Amino acid sequence: MPTAIKTGRNGKTSYVSDKVFLNIPYDEKFEPLYLAFIAGLCGFGLIPVAVLEIPESERRLDRIFSLIRRCKISFHDLSRVELDRKRPPTPRFNMPFELGLAVAWHRIGDASHDWYVFEAKAHRVQKSLSDLNGTEPYIHRGKPRGVLQQVTNALIRRRHRPSVIELEAILGHLKKAAVEIKRELRTKSLFGSRAFKDLVYVAGIIARKHIASLRQTT
């Protein structure tokens, strides 16, 4: 996939245009939607990036902000901002915090950075995060197909415009590959650095097989 690099006023690299910062919860119940986001983004010729793929030697906050700065787009899923089951019950603030960093970067760093909010239920974000009033979240209803539908809505202006049916085909093959990745890495979780990179790599290959316009740009 071709990579376009934008250079800022100071001469330093601002973002890579085909990379998307993916801000999602890292838990097993979210795995079907995790795979759907990867399949959907790769179907548009984009490359998902996430905090979990960056070496732990760097400070976490620095890693997050560095990734956001290098991405033209960021996707933020707020569907799991809820109390966890571990005592004491604590709300999960990572996703809205990372969304805040992306909004700040758009406001004072690079106005061309596009950020999108995803949720499972309509109107819930307006209640839990009222500062977002005026921003319409993309409602996926907690379903992989819903994720794919909303990804196509969010990216309607992109050069590549795969159909939901084409994205579902990519997802179907990626789910099979995910089973093999778990087996090869001897892990039960896909939320690891190596597993994430393998998923993105495989999804990119699958996408080029199914989306004709992607083959024309490679």
Task: Give the residues covered by each predicted segment.
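Conserved beta-strand segments of the P-loop GTPase G domain that flank and frequently precede/overlap
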Residues: N23, V51, D77, F118-E119
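C-terminal interaction surface of TIR/SEFIR-family domains
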Residues: S128-T217
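Cross-kingdom TIR/SEFIR domain
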Residues: R85-A154
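Conserved N-terminal substructure of TIR/SEFIR domains
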Residues: M1-C71, F191-T218
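TIR-domain catalytic/interaction hotspot
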Residues: E53-P96, I108
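Hydrophobic beta-strand scaffold residues
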Residues: P48, S74-F75, G109, W115
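Surface-exposed alpha-helical segments enriched in charged/polar residues
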Residues: A39-C42, S66-R69, G100, A104, ...
